[in-house]
Amino acid sequence: MASDPPPPYPGGPSAPLLEDKHGAPRMEEPRPAPYPQAMAFAPPDCGPPPYDANPGYIAPNPGFYPPPGPYVPMGYYPPSPSQFQPPYPSQYSSPGAQGTAVILPPGPTSTSGTTTVTSNTTTVTVLHGEIFQGSPVQTVCQHCQQPITTKISHEIGLMNFLLCCFCCFVGCDLGCCLIPCIINDLKDVTHTCPNCKAVIYTYRRMC
């Protein structure tokens, strides 16, 4: 017993190495990198954005809907109802006549007027003033309000008197100076109503 060697101390030089007991340490093989589940792909290049022809145009809101009803385009204004009303001529109806008389007022620079008389199927148009001359005229009597044709009568006027004086001055005597007094074209003309005998107008050859 005394000749036996002392037991080796754990961890001493005589202790067998862990490598000798279990062998050389095994080298771990490198593991491959995990394959990514999804790879991000960049979108293909489609070129520059499309050109906007109307840079100031704003697209309407898709959630807006115009109210139902008639559509009126911009810049259009419906005409007022007064534009479709036909003009009403000034007309009056005589109490004893069957037709209707329409009177148009005279113009601003003329002293003569216009009278249009319609009786059944007869239309009479009269211009007051110069139209009353040496012949009968169709008109409406201002007194009896009847459409009539005036009755004329010739009367000696100023022109007859002046022509008689002129004939005496040039030597026409023995009654020759009275010749202008028997010429109707030199006399004044009086227009009267054949119904009520009222004087309508007197046409004077010389005022």
Swiss-Prot record:
UniProt-recorded Gene Ontology molecular function terms: zinc ion binding
* Compartments, record wording: Late endosome membrane; Lysosome membrane
Q: What is its main location?
A: membrane
User: Which InterPro entries does the protein's record reference?
Assistant: LITAF, LITAF_fam
The alphabetized UniProt keywords are: Apoptosis, Endosome, Lysosome, Membrane, Metal-binding, Zinc
Q: How does it sit in the membrane?
A: Peripheral membrane protein
Q: Where is this region: Membrane-binding amphipathic helix?
A: 161-183
Domain of life assignment: Eukaryota
Binding positions (Zn(2+)): 141, 144, 193, 196
**Biased composition regions of type Basic and acidic residues, renumbered to the chain:** 18-31
Q: Which GO terms describe its cellular component?
A: cytoplasmic side of late endosome membrane; cytoplasmic side of lysosomal membrane; nucleus
User: Which is a Pfam family this sequence falls into?
Assistant: zf-LITAF-like
Q: What does the UniProt record say this protein does? A: May act as a p53/TP53-apoptotic effector.
Cite the domain annotation text.
The LITAF domain is stabilized by a bound zinc ion. The LITAF domain contains an amphipathic helix that mediates interaction with lipid membranes.
Q: Which family does it belong to?
A: Belongs to the CDIP1/LITAF family.
Q: What is this protein called?
A: Cell death-inducing p53-target protein 1
